[in-house]
């Protein structure tokens, strides 16, 4: 597996452990992070690693039990990595399970994760939260 794909894999593992220092350490200081519009935690494009923690990871841990990112496949093209998989978790407020397929497009620059774009059916998340 490529170094870029290993970085993406390490990021997902750090998210699953709620390992904030590793998450921040993997992200480029000049970040371009975009969640899918309509995703509950979407608020435009984030430019700083701490934004990912504050606007995504903290709310995920607050709102979901057993949240995980299960990657089924990586498509690697140099410094670009596409990961295909499923989000899973149980919403704490509703008790509903969220199985949600996703595609993530990553770009590595200067040995760090520099860009993230999420593609997913955001309605599935909203249904689990209602």
What are these regions (language model features)?
Residues 1-26, 30, 127-130:
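Short, low-complexity N-terminal intrinsically disordered segments enriched in polar/charged residues
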Residues 2, 43-47, 97:
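Residues at secondary-structure transition points
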Residues 2-14, 49-53, 90, 103:
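Generic alpha-helical hydrophobic packing signal
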Residues 3, 57-130:
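A beta-strand edge to alpha-helix "cap/lid" segment located at domain peripheries
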Residues 8, 12-15, 27, 35, ...:
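Hydrophobic alpha-helical core bundles mediating ligand binding, dimerization, or RNAP-core interactions
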Residues 8-18, 41-44, 60-64, 84:
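Short, mixed-charge, low-aromatic patches
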Residues 8-11, 23-24, 31, 52-53, ...:
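Hydrophobic pocket/interface hotspot
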Residues 22, 28-79:
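A solvent-exposed, acidic/Ser-Thr-rich amphipathic alpha-helical stretch
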């Amino acid at each position: 597996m490529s170094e870029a794909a290993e970085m993406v894999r390490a990021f997902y593992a750090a998210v699953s452990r709620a390992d904030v220092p590793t998450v921040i350490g993997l992200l480029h200081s000049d970040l371009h992070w975009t969640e899918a519009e309509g995703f509950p935690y979407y608020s435009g494009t984030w430019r700083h690693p701490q934004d990912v923690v504050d606007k995504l990871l903290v709310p995920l841990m607050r709102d979901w039990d057993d949240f995980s990112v299960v990657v089924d496949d990586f498509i690697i093209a140099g410094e670009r990595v596409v990961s295909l998989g499923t989000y899973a978790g149980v919403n704490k407020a509703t008790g509903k399970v969220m199985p949600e397929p996703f595609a993530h497009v990553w770009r590595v620059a200067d040995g760090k994760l520099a860009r993230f774009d999420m593609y997913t059916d955001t309605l599935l998340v909203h249904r689990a939260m209602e």
